[in-house]
Amino acid sequence: MVNRLIIAAAGSGKTTYLVRQAMQQSDSVLITTYTIANELEIRKKFVELNGCVPHNVTIQTWYSFLLQHGVRPFQGVILDDKINGMILVNEKSGKKYDGKYGPVYYAETDYRKFYFTDGMKMYSDKIAKFVCRCEKETKGKVSQRISKSYPRIYVDEIQDLAGYDLDIIKSLLQAECDVTMVGDPRQVTYHTHNEAKYKKYADGKMEEFIRSECKKIDCIIDKETLNDSYRNNQSICSYSSQLYEEYGETGTKQFDITGHDGVFFGETR
């Protein structure tokens, strides 16, 4: 199988690239992305280029993907209760009480309090960890099932995945499917959760994760395919490249002259 991590420049046509790649496939394709806004953008691009989303292409947000393919089919190995969806959280969930030195949280052994609200909605910051636990308990059947359902998987906004998300990515990279990950580490906007696990790979350090944690897994690191920006001219690209020297020089496909091009510095009054 062919796995690939593509480091994309801002305005490089990432969405167009993903859609065109998916349109070339005859087998089942999954495109998953972190934000709802980007999911809608991908759907719009399919309509623009193809008139519709092809029947063999599924587009889901990362959370929806994990719930449908990781949680619901395998939750029985952990609990028999009915799960009533999820609840988005922006801080660590499962607080037991406020202690003298800060919040005290439920242990994972109390899984109902650790993973769920009283109404059995799963905390968003625990979904990936729950899926990883299912993967471990079933000896890899979660990733096996996903790979059989989708021989080709495209993960957009890879820079926003964190913590246990990365373990799920690692499992998929070892499964019988082609995984293409695309993202711009210079544009980390959100994190799926603030987990201590793999903290050193936060802020878009997916390349470092692949090189360090996936050494025995074949994965091409591609810094060329989406390295030219259609949005920014060379002055802007060169300035940006100086801020992120570790990613090399970004090129441009933007050659229009408007009279107000380039980088400007304003004075504070």
Positions of the model-derived regions?
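Signature of the SF2 helicase/ATPase Hel1-core->accessory helical subdomain module
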Residues: 159-210
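Loop/turn-to-beta-strand initiation segments
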Residues: 28, 151-152, 176-180
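A short acidic, amphipathic alpha-helical/loop segment
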Residues: 17-21, 45, 142, 164-172
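Accessory N-terminal region flanking or inserted into the helicase ATPase core
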Residues: 2-7, 84-154, 163-164, 168, ...
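P-loop NTPase Walker
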Residues: 1-73
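Conserved RecA-like ASCE P-loop NTPase motor core of nucleic-acid helicases/translocases
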Residues: 18, 27-39, 57, 224-229, ...
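Glycine-rich phosphate-binding "P-loop"
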Residues: 1-12, 125-130, 248-268
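Conserved coupling/interface region of RecA-like P-loop/ASCE motor cores
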Residues: 190-201, 207-252
